């Protein structure tokens, strides 16, 4: 399980739609679908029922969503705490994934 997979899953759940999630994250729909399929394979569960338009979360999907949101919030706090304490706290670091870069 990777934080990026959880981020993709949470964003898809936010919109109840993979297409809208891919637009927000500026990545392809297959990237999000693959990340979610990897999570399903890793945990051996189905996270949502796919519908013609969007999806509905299964019980397992609801559980993962709740815990994934908490985990992502903790990861964000850890990053902030550690970067604020570092010796380079007066500098700005910018990181961009290649798939998210827009020119």
Segments the model singles out, each with a brief description of its role:
Residues 2-5, 29, 54, 61, ...:
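The N-cap/first-turn positions of alpha helices
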Residues 10-28:
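Short helix-boundary/capping micro-motifs
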Residues 84-100:
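Interdomain hinge and pocket-entrance segments immediately C-terminal to HTH DNA-binding domains
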Residues 42-43, 64-86:
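Alpha-helical linker/hinge and terminal dimerization helices associated
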Residues 9, 40-57, 79:
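A short LG(V/I)-centered, amphipathic sequence patch enriched
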Residues 15, 24, 37-46:
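Residue cluster at the C-terminal edge of the helix-turn-helix DNA-binding motif
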């Amino acid at each position: 399980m990777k934080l990026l997979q959880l981020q993709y899953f949470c964003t898809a759940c936010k919109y109840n739609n993979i297409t809208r999630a891919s637009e927000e994250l500026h990545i392809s729909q297959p990237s999000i679908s693959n990340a979610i399929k990897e999570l399903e394979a890793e945990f051996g569960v189905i996270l949502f029922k796919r519908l013609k338009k969007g999806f509905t979360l299964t019980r397992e999907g609801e559980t993962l969503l709740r815990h994934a949101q908490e985990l992502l919030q903790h990861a964000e706090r850890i990053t902030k705490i550690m970067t604020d304490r570092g010796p380079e706290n007066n500098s700005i670091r910018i990181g961009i994934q290649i798939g998210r870069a827009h020119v």
